[in-house]
From Swiss-Prot:
Species assigned in the record: Rickettsia prowazekii (strain Madrid E)
Alphabetically ordered keywords of this record: Cell membrane, Membrane, Transmembrane, Transmembrane helix
Presence of the UniProt keyword Kinase in the record: no
Lineage: Bacteria, Pseudomonadati, Pseudomonadota, Alphaproteobacteria, Rickettsiales
Any one Gene Ontology cellular component term annotated for this protein: plasma membrane
Primary localization class, coarse: membrane
Protein name: Uncharacterized protein RP255
Positions of transmembrane segments: 10-29, 75-93, 98-117, 130-147, 157-179, 199-221, 236-255, 262-284, 289-311, 323-340, 355-374
């Protein structure tokens, strides 16, 4: 495939990521209100919000079997078709159980689409991988910021649901405007156990990053109220994070591509832990509160990208696709673990317990990461 076709494919792939980000942001801001209109109770909505992440885990295990048998394009088209059907179902369905199953299927489609789209971009971008990985995060943040600006004009009605379905249709149309060249040469001599051993640290990192992200989304407001922090509103916090990501993510990814990624990974995790330690101490100061939130958001994004770059350096073709999918699957398990932890209502009763959860996960991981770094002499890479 020519360089011109490569960039054409990447352009449409990134455009698809942007549209997809907008749709997910619309759902994020309006999902609860829309379900309340359907006369669902608060407990039912919370249960849907938790169990929907099962779809990502199911998708992860399913794609491990299919990712090297189906092209990225075919998986993307199947995912988008499923998302269109499930989105329209939101208008039709009124039964609580069916709505819950529908949201599980939506998350199945979201995970499958995002994973396949990211693999598509990685396989095409060659030596520019760090740049286009940064663009994925940049456009995801940009889509969220755009919807945040337009949110006063977006109402949780059936018309909004139809618009989301039409945006998915636009994504499908863009798939027919470029060529997909996914390779499917299976290396039957490859030992999966050896592959897993080589990505052990990346899998654990994926779990930690996604678990912490979910904890912030779920518990930060209650924690901030308890500690009387300067910033309490989650939407405002996300706006600060997305704005800084838009400006910082490309330079961050460029730096990561040039330095020892294992050392960068360890350093970012240590910075993350320090920010969580200092947040309750200095968080009553608005400027410091904003600084720590920005650092936490950018650290999580940089760690996510750093581990993808590590996997790209380690593997090729079949092994790379399997390793990346395993990484994304572990991220989905981390998200679900974070959602399950909300069964214990420490987010609303004892906000300080939010920190205990974070310290337990990040602190133990940083300790293990440091041992792993020294044990396997990763500082030499």
């Amino acid at each position: 495939m020519t360089l011109k076709n490569d960039y054409k494919t990447i352009f449409f792939s990134l455009f698809g990521i942007f549209i997809f980000s907008c749709i997910n942001a619309i759902n994020f801001y309006n999902f609860k209100i829309f379900l309340l209109i359907k006369n669902l109770g608060g407990e039912q909505i919370n249960n849907i919000n938790q169990t929907k992440f099962i779809g990502s885990i199911i998708a992860g295990f399913s794609l491990i079997q299919l990712i090297n048998k189906l092209s990225n394009k075919r998986i993307i088209l199947i995912s988008l078709s499923l998302l269109i059907i499930c989105t329209i179902n939101l208008i039709i369905l009124n039964n609580y159980t069916l709505i819950k199953i529908n949201f599980i299927l939506i998350n199945f489609g979201i995970f499958s689409y995002f994973t396949s789209r990211t693999l598509d971009i990685i396989e095409i971008s060659k030596e520019k991988k760090y740049l286009f990985l940064a663009c994925i995060i940049l456009l995801w943040a940009g889509g969220n910021l755009m919807v945040d600006l337009l949110n006063p004009f977006i109402k949780p009605t059936n018309n909004t649901i139809v618009i989301c379905a039409l945006l998915y249709c636009i994504n499908i149309l863009t798939e027919f405007l470029h060529y997909n060249h996914t390779s499917h040469k299976l290396n039957l001599n490859s030992k999966f156990s050896s592959l897993i051993k080589n990505i052990e640290l990346q899998l654990l990192t994926g779990f930690v990053v996604s678990y912490i992200t979910l904890n912030i989304l779920w518990y930060y407001e209650a924690f901030a109220l308890k500690k009387q922090l300067a910033l309490i509103n989650l939407k405002l916090i996300l706006k600060y994070i997305f704005l800084t990501i838009c400006f910082a993510i490309i330079p961050i990814c460029y730096i990561l591509s040039k330095i020892n990624k294992y050392f960068a990974n360890l350093s970012l995790n240590i910075i993350l832990l320090i920010c969580f330690i200092l947040l309750p101490i200095h968080g009553t100061n608005k400027n410091l509160n904003i600084l720590y939130i920005i650092l936490i958001g950018n650290c999580l994004g940089a760690i996510f990208i750093c581990n993808i770059l590590i996997l790209i350096d380690k593997f090729q073709d079949y092994e790379l696709r399997t390793a990346l999918l395993s990484y994304f699957s572990m991220c989905s398990i981390g998200i679900y673990a974070g959602a399950l932890s909300s069964h214990v209502p420490y987010g609303t009763i004892k906000g300080s317990d939010f920190l205990f959860s974070v310290f337990a996960v990040v602190g133990s991981f940083v300790t293990y990461h440091f041992w792993y770094f020294i044990q396997y002499k990763l500082y030499r890479f």
